[in-house]
């Protein structure tokens, strides 16, 4: 359940970033001068017939933001029920989405470009957080890679940080024209991320996440979009369909940046969670989960072994529970196994 809700919230946030880009690049950020109301109307009751021009982009952005907020609350409730460190993720998501809504409103009221930069940067950080949550609540999170070693763990974390800083520099280009730093950040991204993907392929072999290959394609696309955005805004080069093209290119550039950030965050989390002890458990106990391993205790330790330890090979916990005791007469059924958060 939590995994599906995380995916829906992630997709809604992606659409929210899309409309945020449209608001910025069409100059519609101040099309609606008041907040939290819309021309005096309640946010949810503003007439659709009056949503034209910049008002359409700005008010749609607010409505989608409200939807993301509600989805985040639902996701947080699901994560909270899972307990453990999932509760910290739930708390972080709620704090981030509330802060993001307040920043967006203050941007309208105070007319500060600094708030716009922080608002855009936090939106991408929130997308990265949701990407991590979607991964951690999936079955893929239970499949460890081959031990990547400390250097690759540090490198994947560095890649995620560098990509995020480059996104912040992109916001500075949009609102303050800081182009030189953004080009320098692009060089850093293209220096680090391809190395990460190459190292993952070499160290993990067939276990390498497909996302590592997807990252290279996203980087190539991002380079083309970045060059196109630069030519349209900072040069006199003629571009076909200039008005439409110069709206599409920067918006697409921002969206692909979100995907790159999400991918690098997921890779960083995946690699960081893959440690030698976890890999050893996976190799010596095929088919068992980490929870089963922990519950069994060491051989000869005197601790009682859980049901999972005496389970027939290939039979999952869900199947054990559904079969009943031998000779009990209860019908045997074999439901599909699920992780607690799915």
What is each PLM-predicted segment?
Residues 2-29:
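N-terminal signal-anchor transmembrane alpha helix
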Residues 23-32, 98-121, 172-181, 226-258:
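Interfacial helix-loop-helix junctions of multi-pass membrane proteins
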Residues 68-74, 123-139, 185-197, 254-270:
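Hydrophobic cores of alpha-helical transmembrane segments in multi-pass inner/ER membrane proteins
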Residues 12-13, 95-97, 151-171, 218-219:
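Alpha-helical transmembrane segments of multi-pass integral membrane proteins
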Residues 24-59, 241-242:
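Extracytosolic (periplasmic/ER-lumenal) interhelical loops and adjacent juxtamembrane/interface segments
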Residues 49-71, 175-179:
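Individual transmembrane alpha-helix segments
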Residues 4-6, 83-94, 151-157, 206-215:
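Membrane-interfacial loop-to-transmembrane alpha-helix junctions, especially the N-terminal start
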Residues 289-310, 314-337:
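Long, intrinsically disordered low-complexity tandem-repeat segments
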């Amino acid at each position: 359940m939590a995994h599906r809700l995380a995916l829906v919230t992630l997709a809604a946030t992606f659409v929210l970033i899309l409309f945020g880009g449209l608001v910025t690049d069409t100059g519609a950020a101040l099309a609606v001068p008041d907040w939290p109301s819309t021309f005096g109307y309640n946010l949810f009751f503003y007439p659709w017939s009056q949503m034209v021009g910049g008002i359409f982009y700005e008010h749609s952005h607010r409505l989608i933001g409200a939807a993301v907020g509600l989805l985040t609350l639902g996701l947080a409730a699901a994560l909270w029920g899972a307990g453990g460190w999932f509760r910290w993720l739930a708390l972080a998501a709620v704090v981030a989405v509330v802060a993001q809504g307040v920043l967006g409103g203050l941007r309208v009221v105070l007319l500060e470009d600094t708030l716009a930069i922080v608002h855009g940067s936090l939106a991408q950080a929130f997308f990265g957080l949701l990407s991590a949550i979607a991964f951690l609540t999936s079955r893929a999170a239970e499949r460890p890679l081959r031990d990547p070693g400390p250097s690759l763990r540090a490198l994947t974390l560095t890649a995620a940080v560098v990509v995020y800083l480059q996104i912040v520099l992109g916001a500075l280009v949009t609102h303050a024209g800081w182009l030189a730093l953004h080009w320098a950040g692009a060089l850093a991204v293209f220096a680090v991320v391809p190395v990460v993907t190459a190292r993952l392929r070499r160290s993990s072999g067939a276990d390498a996440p497909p996302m590592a290959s997807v990252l290279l394609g996203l980087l190539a696309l991002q380079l083309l979009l970045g060059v196109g955005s630069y030519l349209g805004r900072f040069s006199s080069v003629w571009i076909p369909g200039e008005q439409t093209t110069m709206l599409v290119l920067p918006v697409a550039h921002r969206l692909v940046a979100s995907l790159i950030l999400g991918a690098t965050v997921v890779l960083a989390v995946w690699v960081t969670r893959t440690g030698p002890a976890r890999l050893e458990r996976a190799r010596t106990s095929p088919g068992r989960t980490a929870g089963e391993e922990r519950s069994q205790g060491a051989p000869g330790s005197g601790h009682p072994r859980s049901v999972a330890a005496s389970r027939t090979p290939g039979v999952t916990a869900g199947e054990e529970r559904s079969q009943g005791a031998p000779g009990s007469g209860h019908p045997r059924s074999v439901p599909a196994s699920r992780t607690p958060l799915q």
